[in-house]
Amino acid sequence: MERYQQLFSQLAARHEGAFVPFVTLGDPNPTLSLRIIDTLIDAGADALELGIPFSDPLADGPTIQNANLRAFSSGVTPAHCFEMLATIRQKYPAIPIGLLMYANLVYNEGIDAFYAHCAEVGIDSVLVADVPLQESLPFRQAALRHNVAPIVICPPNSDDALLREIASHGRGYTYLLARAGVTGSEKRANTPLKHLIDTLKEYHAAPTLQGFGISEPGQVRTALHAGTAGAISGSAIVRIIEKHEDNPAVMLEQLAQFVRELKAATRG
């Protein structure tokens, strides 16, 4: 958890926001997946949000669903993913690493055992996408026991009572949904809801990162001007992987260019 605090402090001192890419571990295969993660970090990613392939990713649109299928077809299992995570952490000791998960993957290992495994390989946060806040207590308790930040989603229609709960229960960062629905850059991010961000700050919530539909530098700037601490981009990145799956050199260069452009937007 402390890696997020250190990151946000360092960025604030430089008057920068965070740019956080999302990819699915093992997409399109384990070897290239690790090269992709190297490329994202080398191009300026401030933190990583990583998915473990899941057969029924309800919160995701077709782009990330296809990433899950590619990873599955290359034989990736949760055990492989944890091996990859240990490799990434050993190579990059300072960068915050978060997992975006579905509850069945946590249940399969056992809630406490899963979070213990996360701590063992150096994971900083876990967002369980299909568990609403009111059902999240066992996950949050296990996360905190193992010093893993439980990430809480803030929907765009949150009322004051929910914002208080989000501020109370979240750690690491707060995942601010730019709009309702599933992931996908084909649906643009709405204008950030500044009153949500201001209220979360008033209630001392973990810093907000805006996600869903972030695909252009202008959207990153808009999110930061509204008061977020940064932005998460997933589908736009995964689409580059999908488009250039058969030409890794082009894929990696396109990914680097995309990350450089969106990271540059965090500098004002």
Curated annotation (Swiss-Prot):
Its EC number is 4.2.1.20. This is Tryptophan synthase alpha chain. It catalyses: (1S,2R)-1-C-(indol-3-yl)glycerol 3-phosphate + L-serine = D-glyceraldehyde 3-phosphate + L-tryptophan + H2O. It comes from Sodalis glossinidius (strain morsitans). Belongs to the TrpA family. Keywords: Amino-acid biosynthesis, Aromatic amino acid biosynthesis, Lyase, Tryptophan biosynthesis. Tetramer of two alpha and two beta chains. HAMAP family: Trp_synth_alpha.
